[in-house]
Amino acid sequence: MQSITIRRPDDWHLHLRDGAILEGVIADTSRTFARAIIMPNLVPPVVTTADAKAYRERILKALPDGHRFQPLMTLYLTEQTSPDDVEAGAASGLITAVKLYPAGATTNSHGGVRDMEKAMPVLERMAKIGLPLCVHGEVTTPDVDIFDREAVFIDTVLDPLRRRLPELKVTMEHVTTAGGIDYIKAAQGNLAGSITTHHLIINRNAILVGGIRPHYYCLPVAKRENHRLALRAAAVSGDPRFFLGTDSAPHVDPLKECACGCAGIYTSINTMSCLAHVFEEEGALDRLEAFASLNGPAWYGLSPNEERITLSKQADPVVFPAKIETGAGAVTVFDPMVPLHWQVSASA
């Protein structure tokens, strides 16, 4: 039986939600991942250090007995965010990063930033203290095609910001385009990118061919095949500027299967099996550890995990549940549309 053992991975972009959904999904992450950067777009959002502290306590309370997992908390950047509160949260060790959502870019982002100038005092303080900014890299102006949002964001928001504050450390989250990959590669320091599991596997055909398939709809939306291949090449390259951020985003089925469905794909339960499949296809299993376990901690100034996991290739496909049942309703699990043969187990 073929197997590989790697350091226990981390997830550098995760939605856990709250309440019954949090309680229903957290084990799928904490079973495999040691740490995760937790997204702050709750209702209401996590905008202060006190909010983050309370949310972290709810996450830890929901952990199953025996699971060792560290939630890395973020703040939701608004035009009213206090630089002093951000600095205090970072100094306490509670706040790992601040998240920029352009208003209206994704789920629960209506309270995000509309005028970047109003957020500059916080961003200047973050640059000074070395606190990373995580960005949802899309513009939301109505005259921009949804498939062009990332490219326009780079040109009109991200690049001007980085020129103005070159000391600011920026994570371009869930990169979806070849242009985004090229922009990160060309950058001179202080820029890295997370890549999701699902964007390595699906292109936009998955959403639209054969009928509307809401469980493949996410934001940023999946792009053309050439972009998917560029993401794959970056992920398997070993380049330390690229690392795993699943953007696993649970929604109960009625919020996905409706006339105006929510964006988000739930991948926490089968991400490592999917990634092993992708890296094997690309002849790069030896670089899976870098992408999932090493590059992210290095970027965020943390040590890699000492624990290991083993992925073993099974003769028969590994069976994952089609849905996760939560107290709020069922959440559909990402279907990669190919059999998965890699199974995760803990290792000494």
From Swiss-Prot:
Keywords from the UniProt entry: Hydrolase, Metal-binding, Pyrimidine biosynthesis, Zinc
GO biological process, any: 'de novo' UMP biosynthetic process
Gene this protein is translated from: pyrC
Cofactor, how bound (note): Binds 2 Zn(2+) ions per subunit.
Residues annotated with N6-carboxylysine modification: 99
Quaternary organization: Homodimer.
Amino-acid positions noted as binding Zn(2+) 1 in the UniProt annotation, renumbered to this chain: 13, 15, 99, 247
Enzyme Commission numbers on file: 3.5.2.3
Residue numbers annotated as active site: 247
Cofactor(s), names only, from the UniProt record: Zn(2+)
Reaction equations catalysed: (S)-dihydroorotate + H2O = N-carbamoyl-L-aspartate + H(+)
Protein name: Dihydroorotase
Positions annotated to bind Zn(2+) 2: 99, 136, 174
Cited Gene3D superfamilies: Metal-dependent hydrolases
Family: Belongs to the metallo-dependent hydrolases superfamily. DHOase family. Class II DHOase subfamily.
The species this protein was found in: Rhizobium etli (strain ATCC 51251 / DSM 11541 / JCM 21823 / NBRC 15573 / CFN 42)
